[in-house]
Amino acid sequence: CTIKWKVSNQENNSKEEKVLQKILDILPKKFKLRIDPNGGWSRQKAQEWSNELRDEPRLEWIEQPLPSNDIEGLFVLANQIPIALDESLVEFPHLKKIWKSWQIRRPALDGDPRLLLKEIEREDCHAVISTAFETGIGRRWINHLAARQVKGKNPCAPGLAPGWCPEGALFHSNPKVVWEAV
């Protein structure tokens, strides 16, 4: 099981540090933890969390700890602790080719999903399939890609945000219903 924790970007938040300790105290050994500050940390704060979590075996990664344009800082951190890129990949698509750690990939933003399908079947791929705001048709592709990735050479729990999808014909899982709504 994988737990994702969205954290704040406040520079001095001792409450979050206490929550982290509580999470680590109760998190079963088989669980994985992902921490997501949405690019809101300074290098100093990211380094503090890195120092705290460096030897934590349940940490899967910290997702986009620094602003998307702090590429140098992200590479420095990635040499110390697992870092997954998210917003940086949207702003700087060339990073998809050179970032060797995990990448949060949103097929609806990536373009042709067949290219991502080929990519996730490679042994050196560290893509994590995630959602944006898709219609029912896009959601079907995402579910297909996520299922392939989970069974692939580098399996990883996808970020599918279950239960967020609005109701209505555009978000229906049957393409015919979506098409008729359009």
Task: List the predicted regions and their residue ranges.
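Hydrophobic faces of well-ordered beta-strands that scaffold small-molecule active sites
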Residues: 1-5, 31-37, 60-63, 83-87, ...
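Flexible C-terminal active-site loop/helix
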Residues: 43, 132-182
